[in-house]
């Protein structure tokens, strides 16, 4: 059933990526050619990689940006040599372009016209969903009920607490669906379905270890879904999101400072803030801010050529994480930094320079903090350290193998008695209790978020959504790789959580925040309503 749910969710996601129909067209009045406008944001210039290439020596490599906003089509000069003329008048800022208006770029005149395809079909075909969202949610509910029922009898006698967990999960899931469908009136719910499915597996797995922690995780799921919708609201307009970026960065830096001053050391890292009996990790929320501040609209990319502000912000974030001793999360930030830098600059040399600087920085840290090397002493040699530094990985490998393809049954595993089993080692618990088949399905589900983001980003309403979706999914996928490869001794064990599934309220809230960026890249999120 888990495979069926994943298949329906992913197929519905991929089938709803709309084909590239032209929105409008530019008619070149010099050579009489019609240039289709395929995207919501289009670069114009002499550069061969521009969306609209102007073959004129008078044009700048990056001359202008032509984009669609609520008020219509907008053209903006991006500090070009000879400027942009609209109906014979030079523009000094962004101006609205209407049908039959003439734009002059580099001596070439382009007349905006309606797309012939749009004229014939009236509107681009865009399906609401390939499968009924409510039907998939019913399947997820049945899956959760059966898993909770197994957990009720896992101890040998009937325990009703797992049914309470299921009831709460059922309520959170269906309330989220009804709010999305009938209050926000969105037609797409597939991303949320996948998130709910993966989160439910994590919460039910945790229920077999500690019921109290499972209730806390459900509360985190509810907060995460609210956070998800808040992010969607904040980035509903790319220009609004751009104005919010500096404030988001300031809030993130304040969180990191609070963490450095008041943070408590837990499991070797000073990244926990304690409030009474509750604790949370500010660095998890900073992940969302990192994506938010790092991305940009096409106009912002073309007019601001350097990455100085983002580099400084990234240095503050990663420096703070290193001071806290959280090298796993610092690695996740670094990979995401490379992704954002490449997507914003498109320059491979920039990436190589960043990696070289990082390598030098790593050697510098090793020189002044040599104790860090001891954390990697068992890497690739865990069976030689079975009772000390390799204790956790050897137990994961042993108990995961005992689960076979179908698992021992929820709550019947032995790995749950090992320290950090439901958080850092949760992949081993999935293999032992749920079976290797479902564990691999979960990994493929997370990995396909990255593939989907890449495909959907081409049709996004703005480069802001494209960059944010690709980098958010990249962060999630890399975090998954570090967690899974760490517990099976392919990579060093860093304490990075498995997205959606691992115990940790801060982590769950954060990953739902990242999921909002992927959701925003779906053209239907803001364009279609019930």
Predicted feature locations:
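Intrinsically disordered, low-complexity acidic Ser/Thr-rich regulatory segments
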Residues: 1-56, 117-125
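A structural signal for hydrophobic alpha-helical transmembrane segments in multi-pass membrane proteins
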Residues: 122-267, 509-521
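Hydrophobic alpha-helical transmembrane segments
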Residues: 168-172, 223-224, 432-451
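A juxtamembrane structural motif centered on a specific transmembrane helix
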Residues: 483-530
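Loop-to-helix entry and N-terminal half of a specific, functionally important transmembrane alpha helix
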Residues: 456-495, 501
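Forkhead-associated
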Residues: 36-108
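Hydrophobic alpha-helical segments of polytopic membrane proteins
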Residues: 304-323, 327-367
């Amino acid at each position: 059933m888990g495979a069926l749910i994943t298949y329906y969710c992913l197929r519905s996601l991929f089938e709803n990526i709309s084909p590239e129909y032209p929105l409008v067209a530019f008619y070149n009045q010099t050579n009489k050619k019609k240039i289709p406008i395929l995207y919501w944001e289009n670069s114009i210039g002499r550069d061969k990689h521009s969306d609209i290439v102007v073959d004129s020596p008078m044009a700048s490599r990056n001359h202008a940006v032509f984009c669609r906003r609520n008020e219509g089509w907008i053209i903006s000069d991006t500090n070009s040599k000879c400027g942009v003329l609209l109906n014979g008048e030079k523009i000094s800022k962004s101006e609205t372009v209407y049908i039959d208006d003439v734009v002059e770029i580099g001596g070439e005149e382009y007349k905006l016209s309606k797309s012939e395809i749009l004229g014939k079909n009236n509107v681009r075909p865009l399906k609401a969903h390939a499968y009924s969202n409510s039907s998939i949610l019913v399947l997820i509910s049945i899956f959760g009920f059966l898993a909770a029922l197994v957990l009720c009898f896992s101890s040998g006698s009937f325990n009703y607490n797992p049914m309470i967990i299921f009831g709460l999960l059922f309520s959170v899931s269906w309330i989220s669906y009804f709010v999305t469908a009938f209050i926000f009136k969105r037609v797409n719910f597939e991303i949320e379905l996948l998130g709910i499915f993966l989160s439910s597996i994590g919460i039910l797995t945790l229920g077999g270890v500690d019921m109290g922690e499972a209730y806390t995780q459900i509360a985190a799921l509810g907060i995460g879904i609210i956070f998800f919708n808040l992010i969607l609201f904040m980035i509903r307009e790319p220009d609004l999101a751009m104005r919010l970026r500096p404030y988001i960065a300031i809030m993130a830096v304040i969180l990191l400072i609070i963490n450095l001053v008041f943070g408590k050391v837990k499991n070797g890292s000073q990244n926990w803030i304690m409030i009474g009996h509750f604790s949370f990790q500010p660095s998890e929320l900073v992940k969302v801010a990192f994506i938010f501040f790092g991305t940009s609209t096409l106009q912002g990319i073309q007019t601001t050529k350097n990455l100085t502000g983002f580099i400084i912000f990234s240095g503050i974030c990663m420096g703070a994480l290193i001071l806290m001793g959280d090298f796993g999360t610092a690695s996740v930030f670094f990979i995401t930094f490379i992704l954002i830098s490449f997507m914003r600059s498109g320059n491979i040399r920039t990436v190589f320079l960043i990696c070289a600087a990082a390598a030098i920085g790593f050697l510098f840290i090793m020189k002044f903090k040599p104790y860090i090397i001891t954390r990697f002493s068992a890497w690739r040699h865990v069976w030689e350290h079975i009772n000390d530094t390799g204790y956790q990985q050897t137990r994961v490998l042993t108990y995961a193998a005992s689960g076979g393809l179908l698992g021992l049954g929820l709550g019947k595993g032995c790995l749950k008695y090992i320290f950090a089993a439901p958080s850092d080692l949760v992949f081993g618990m999935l293999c032992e209790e749920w079976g290797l088949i479902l564990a691999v399905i979960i990994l493929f589900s997370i990995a396909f978020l990255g593939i989907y983001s890449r495909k959907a980003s081409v049709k996004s309403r703005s480069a802001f959504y494209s960059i944010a979706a690709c980098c958010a999914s990249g962060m999630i996928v890399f975090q998954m790789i570090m967690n899974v490869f760490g517990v099976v001794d392919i990579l060093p064990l860093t304490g990075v959580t498995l997205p959606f599934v691992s115990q940790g309220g801060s982590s769950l809230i954060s990953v739902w925040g990242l999921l909002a960026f992927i959701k925003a890249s779906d053209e239907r999120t803001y364009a279609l309503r019930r």
